[in-house]
Regions:
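Short, conserved micro-motifs composed of acidic
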Residues: 2-214
Length: 214
């Protein structure tokens, strides 16, 4: 007599539930993926910042580009990559209008993408070790590069700018005298096109240690 073979009904229901979890082969959110050599290099790449629409990626890099300049030292430069319609990031390229023989890094964009805030270090127009600068995008070219001034910058290190969504408040890190720790978070407010005297965010935010990258 032939013995009937069957799968217990509870196993069948369990298989159905597991099958619901199998959606696609696209890695789920939360999985860390290396962005590959279109973004990364053999040098240090860090300080990423996205545009408000998440379609532009700014970052700082110490990569060594091919150069025929004698005794050219490796420094920090700003790079940018754009997200295409297929969800692929373009090959990052140097922001030539911004980069100089000095160190540039830690950038952020305004909501409309037309104003760039970044830090530049050890330059003749710097008040301190590193200062905050701005640049304007006109006809697809970054121009009107200027120091944000003594109201914002100090005689020490000022870097890591981060703009509020409203675009009127700029947060940044500084190790200037008078802080609560080694480096603190400060802010400045734009009123009628001018940045006000920067202020410390206070002991609720800052500690006796380092606060950076707001």
């Amino acid at each position: 007599q032939e013995i009937a073979q069957f799968v217990p009904i509870e196993y069948y229901y369990e298989m159905v539930e597991h099958r619901k979890l199998i959606d696609t082969l696209i890695p789920p959110k939360g999985v860390l993926l290396n962005m590959g050599f279109s973004i990364n290099s053999r040098g240090a790449d860090y300080g990423p910042a996205l545009s408000q629409n998440n379609d532009a990626l700014l970052f700082t890099s110490q990569r060594e580009e091919l150069s025929f300049e004698i005794n050219k030292s490796k420094n920090e430069d700003l790079y940018i990559s754009y997200l295409d319609a297929y969800g692929t990031w373009s090959k990052a390229y140097a922001m030539e209008e911004i980069n100089s023989n000095y160190n540039e890094g830690s950038a952020c964009l305004s909501a409309d993408g037309n104003t760039l805030y970044f830090s530049r270090c050890d330059c003749p127009s710097c008040y301190g070790d590193c200062d905050l600068f701005s640049a304007s995008l006109k006809d697809s070219t970054w121009t009107d590069i200027k120091n944000l001034g003594i109201n914002v910058n100090s005689l020490s290190w000022d870097s890591h700018p981060s703009l509020s969504h409203s675009g009127d408040t700029l947060f940044f890190a500084s190790d200037r005298l008078g802080g609560f720790g080694l480096s603190d978070i400060y802010f400045t407010i734009n009123k009628d096109g001018f940045w006000t005297q920067s202020q410390n965010l206070g002991p609720i935010i800052n500690t006796r240690n380092n606060e950076v990258s707001p």
